[in-house]
């Protein structure tokens, strides 16, 4: 069982959604993750929101014209997410992820990597990488008090990914070693006959 389900009991979907609705109503920008991801995409790119929760990031990316799927294994979160018909929703544990499609970009926002079941981190990053097309990007963000940037880099490297960029926030603040947040972008390598088309 993931640390998220252990800590929440899989029952926080409605309250989580309401908290973000209140933030948005107060004028707060609740689309920082989607803004960063959208800046890495081309029109119509296929996106997987891994650990999508209530679908906040996935729904916003779909609204912007991208082909989006979301996956989570918290039933209360997916209940909220499924209210949006513009996204394909999957109920699956990321440690067992085996979807019938591949993506130009996989995003794991909102501390997904630090809420995984202990000991599954490497397998999850490997499975996320396997869902990328050659040249595809894995974008992850988390609090650094629960996992260091270096530890995540090791997971990504072992999954065959190459580092592309790192920031201290979803607003692309330059990386600092003492940052509270880490947002990392890694790429699945391309071979000469598997080039991502422009």
Give short role names for the model-derived ranges.
Residues 122-134:
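A short glycine-rich, Lys/Arg-flanked "PGG" loop and its adjoining helix->strand segment in the class I
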Residues 176-198:
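Core SAM-dependent methyltransferase catalytic element
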Residues 95-105:
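A short acidic, Gly/Pro-enriched loop at the edge of an enzyme's catalytic core
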Residues 54-96:
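Class I SAM-dependent methyltransferase SAM/SAH-binding core
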Residues 1-53:
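Conserved class I S-adenosyl-L-methionine
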Residues 135-142:
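Conserved beta-strand signature within the Rossmann-like core of class I S-adenosyl-L-methionine
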């Amino acid at each position: 069982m993931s640390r998220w389900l252990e800590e929440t009991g899989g029952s926080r979907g409605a309250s989580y959604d309401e908290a973000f609705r209140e933030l948005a109503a107060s004028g707060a920008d609740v689309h920082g993750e989607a803004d960063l991801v959208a800046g890495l995409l081309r029109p119509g790119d296929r996106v997987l929101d891994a650990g999508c929760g209530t679908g906040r990031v996935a729904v916003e990316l779909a609204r912007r014209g991208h082909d989006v799927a979301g996956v989570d294994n918290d039933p209360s979160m997916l209940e909220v997410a499924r209210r949006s018909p513009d996204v394909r929703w999957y109920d699956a544990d990321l440690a067992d992820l085996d979807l019938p499609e591949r993506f130009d970009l996989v995003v794991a926002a909102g501390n997904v990597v630090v809420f995984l079941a202990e000991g599954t981190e490497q397998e999850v990053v490997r499975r996320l990488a396997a869902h990328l097309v050659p040249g595809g990007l894995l974008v992850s963000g988390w609090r650094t008090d629960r996992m260091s940037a270096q530890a995540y880099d090791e997971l990504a490297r072992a999954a065959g990914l190459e580092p592309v960029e790192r920031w201290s926030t979803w607003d692309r603040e330059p990386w600092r070693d003492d940052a509270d947040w880490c947002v990392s972008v890694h790429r699945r390598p391309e071979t000469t006959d598997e080039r991502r088309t422009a």
